[in-house]
């Protein structure tokens, strides 16, 4: 076990993490030059396009060090985005060390810090690396100072490298061997392995990526998942050298994959512990307790997804089921809306996660979707003392029954160059943020705010990027539920409530948002043969109204001169017809109208 090193790479988006992983794989001969391609570990199209890593991937590499020994290096590539922080913490807990990659021209950014703290909390050894040293504007001294200031680890011996040109790769590998500890664990005890990630393969079922902590798992043994208590036989196991390579057994300290022909991903939960089913003469028996750190992930953001054609509901359900195979943190349940028909209420980890799920549904499964405005989970205390959780505005009880509503509050860390502090603070205050702290680290400023999650969900991230010209970065973590004066604003069209357009907002903004949504609807809904009234209401109080004028035919065109009563008769007849139409007519709300709410400015 002394010759094994498990490490991962922590970096902010675009700091060159995946490119560095490519270079390390190339240097260790994991793939021949013919098979090498850019960002080898980011296998989904969407990962490539957005330049982000979503699922954790691994590579088991052989490296011959300068001391002549051959070491087994297991590189575990982690996602960098705050939405996937649970996957990051699983990947990191499977490692003993991490390379902290910082772009020498940009310095430390928010997600680097968040993930680095996770690593330090888990007791992982962090080795700083300064990437992109080949750029003319690289400033290594400033980057080192920021690492020491912001993260508080010693950066004197940070390794300069350039993943693009391949400079400094050997130094990094030597540092991995010299500075990171070998894995701990009992190679002869009852086997325990942690599931770092799992995904669904069309041919073999669920593939589990595991880090074996104690003991040995062999082909053909029956294993038990400790969180779900289900038992499966091992059909194949092996390692990825990015390509998959079958082995007979995985030993303590190794990272590899196990395939058991499992049909549904729910059985293999990320973070769960795998052990043997029962004691047999030739094995060490099942483990007594699971590895620490497993938790069920709770979605933070909810939105409705509906097919554009009612007939495609079944396809959407299939698509969601398949996507869920690869994404255990996605939750969904069927719901019916009067306006949109049958669809699903989906729960996501955060906004990026939501966008990615939508995009994968559209791209990989060819679905046309309508998405309702994202909302968060509110705790509602009723007059009787019961507390219910409401994640869908249309499920909010009537005003008279509610004692208080509590909304989720998050702590937000914002990092930006000091030139942008003013605009960012203005934005945070508009979003009901309460400033907790402000710290200067060299040229960077870190602001800490408490904010309602509901305010972040809509468009905070986009606005933050625009007021700071893309320089600010953020991450957030859930803090608590806190009582707040929020109300549900209903949108009525000709007196009928359209449930998919309901929004929950703070009372101070309710008038403004109600007016803005009504105005938006007026632009989107086509003119009918009769007047259409669009109203925004809180309970029974109407707070805003817009009218769409009727289309009318000029019934007087054929009258020349003559008596006024003749004209009046024709106008009255038209009016009576319009009134009759209005009683039986229903207004079609077009798809665009539902999307338009998402773009309502504050």
From Swiss-Prot:
Keywords in alphabetical order: Cell inner membrane, Cell membrane, GTP-binding, Hydrolase, Membrane, Nucleotide-binding, Protein biosynthesis
Domain tr-type G: 2-184
Its EC number(s): 3.6.5.n1
CC terms in the record's Gene Ontology section: plasma membrane
Enzymatic class: hydrolase
Subcellular location: Cell inner membrane
Residues binding GTP, per UniProt: 14-19, 131-134
Pfam family, one: GTP_EFTU_D2
Catalyzed chemical reaction(s): GTP + H2O = GDP + phosphate + H(+)
Sample GO molecular function, one term: ribosome binding
Topology within the bilayer: Peripheral membrane protein
Family from the record: Belongs to the TRAFAC class translation factor GTPase superfamily. Classic translation factor GTPase family. LepA subfamily.
Name recorded for this polypeptide: Elongation factor 4
Species: Leptothrix cholodnii (strain ATCC 51168 / LMG 8142 / SP-6) (Leptothrix discophora (strain SP-6))
Gene name, Swiss-Prot/TrEMBL: lepA
């Amino acid at each position: 076990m002394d010759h094994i090193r498990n490490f991962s790479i922590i970096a902010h988006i675009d700091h060159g993490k995946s490119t560095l992983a490519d270079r390390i794989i190339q240097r260790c001969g994991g793939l021949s030059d013919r098979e090498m391609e850019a960002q080898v570990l980011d296998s989904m199209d969407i990962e490539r396009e957005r330049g982000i890593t979503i699922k954790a991937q691994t590579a088991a590499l052989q490296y011959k060090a300068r001391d002549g020994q051959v070491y087994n290096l297991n590189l575990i590539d982690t996602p960098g985005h705050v939405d996937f922080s649970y996957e990051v913490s699983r990947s990191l807990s499977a490692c003993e060390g991490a390379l902290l990659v910082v772009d020498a021209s940009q310095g430390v950014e928010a997600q680097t810090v968040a993930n680095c703290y996770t690593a330090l909390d888990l007791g992982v050894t962090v080795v700083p690396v300064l990437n992109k040293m080949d750029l003319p504007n690289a400033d290594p001294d400033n980057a080192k100072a920021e690492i020491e200031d912001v993260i508080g680890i010693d950066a004197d011996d940070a390794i300069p490298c350039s993943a693009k040109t391949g400079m400094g790769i050997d130094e990094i590998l030597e540092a991995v061997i010299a500075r990171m500890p070998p894995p701990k664990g009992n190679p002869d005890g009852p086997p325990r392995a942690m599931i770092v990630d799992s995904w669904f393969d069309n041919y073999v079922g669920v593939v589990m990526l595991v880090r074996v902590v104690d003991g040995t798992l062999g082909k053909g043994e029956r294993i038990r998942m400790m969180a779900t208590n289900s038992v499966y036989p091992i059909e194949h196991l092996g390692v990825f050298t990015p390509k998959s390579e079958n082995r007979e057994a995985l030993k303590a300290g190794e990272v590899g994959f196990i395939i058991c022909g499992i049909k549904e991903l729910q059985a293999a939960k990320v973070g769960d512990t795998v052990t043997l089913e029962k004691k047999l003469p030739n094995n060490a028996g099942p483990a007594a307790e699971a590895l620490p750190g497993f938790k069920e992930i709770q979605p933070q953001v909810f939105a409705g997804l509906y097919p554009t054609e009612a007939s495609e509901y079944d396809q959407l359900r299939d698509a969601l089921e398949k996507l869920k195979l690869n994404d255990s943190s996605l939750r969904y349940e069927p719901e019916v809306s009067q306006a949109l028909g049958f669809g699903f209420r989906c729960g996501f980890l955060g906004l990026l996660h939501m966008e990615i799920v939508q995009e994968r549904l559209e791209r990989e499964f060819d679905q046309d979707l309508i998405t309702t405005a994202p909302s968060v989970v509110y705790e509602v205390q009723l007059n009787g003392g019961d507390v219910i959780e409401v994640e869908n505005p249309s499920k909010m009880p009537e005003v008279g029954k509610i004692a208080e509503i509590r909304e989720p509050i998050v702590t937000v860390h914002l990092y930006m160059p000091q030139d942008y502090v003013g605009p960012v603070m203005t934005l945070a205050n508009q979003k009901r943020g309460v400033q907790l702290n402000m710290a200067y680290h060299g040229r960077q400023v870190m602001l800490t705010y408490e904010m309602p999650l509901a305010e972040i969900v809509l468009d905070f991230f986009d606005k933050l990027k625009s007021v700071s010209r893309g320089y600010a970065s953020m991450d957030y973590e859930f803090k608590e539920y806190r009582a707040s004066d929020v109300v549900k604003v209903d949108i009525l069209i000709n007196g009928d409530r359209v449930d998919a357009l309901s929004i929950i907002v703070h009372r101070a903004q309710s008038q403004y948002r109600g007016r803005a949504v009504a105005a938006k609807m007026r632009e989107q809904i086509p003119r009918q043969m009769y007047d259409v009234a669009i109203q925004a209401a809180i309970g029974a109080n109407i707070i805003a109204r817009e009218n769409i004028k009727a289309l009318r035919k000029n019934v007087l065109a054929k009258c020349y001169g003559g008596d006024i009563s003749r004209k009046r008769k024709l106008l009255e007849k038209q009016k009576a017809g319009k009134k009759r139409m209005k009683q039986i007519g229903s207004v079609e709300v077009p798809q665009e109208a539902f999307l338009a709410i998402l773009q309502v400015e504050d």
